[in-house]
Amino acid sequence: MNNIILEIAKCCEVEKAKLNDSHSCNKIVMSQNDSFQLTEPWNGHLDNAEILFISSNPSIDPNENYPTASWKDEDIVSFFENRFEITPKNEWSTYWRTILKWAGWIIPNIGFDKIAITEIVHCKSQKEFGVYECMNFCAEKWLKEVLSVYNGKYIVLVGKVAQIFNDKVKEICPNKIIIKTPHFSRPVKGLTDEKRKQDFLDQLH
């Protein structure tokens, strides 16, 4: 498992994309500066998680203390595996707080020790910049690898990009329960928390 984390974090396509304007990942890779934040494999204890959330790609904060190529391998693995534990609660992102609430609709009182998050595209960018150009390439390269580590029962596809790959996720994980929900950052008219919760519960059966 640690090998997969490092393979994704140090994805060999990044350097290829920097040198090739026609590479599917060129746009998203070149959106970062010289201090490249590593490709994000997943967050949490994926092999022990009971719920996995999949969204489009990780957002980027240039000021975050986040792994770069200068980090030791063991520190990179530890960062992603233990990210929820090492991040103070007052620094949790809106996304983290939201999925924790959603997870509680599936398994009451669940904590981040049993939740993992990953993305279709593993490179970071702001507002999904470059995602549509590289999503098929990235999913083909890494989605099966990531899902092979996950032993839990529930997969939540958050937002449009993740749901494009619904059939592929089902093919890889035919025995999982897959729940689809709009991304909270893209408001849907009339979709209250109560309606979203009921939609979650309806998809559990």
Regions found by a protein language model. Give the residues of each.
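Glycine/proline-rich loop-helix segments at beta-alpha junctions forming the active-site rim
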Residues: 1-9, 34, 121-205
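A polyanion-binding, active-site-adjacent surface
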Residues: 2-150
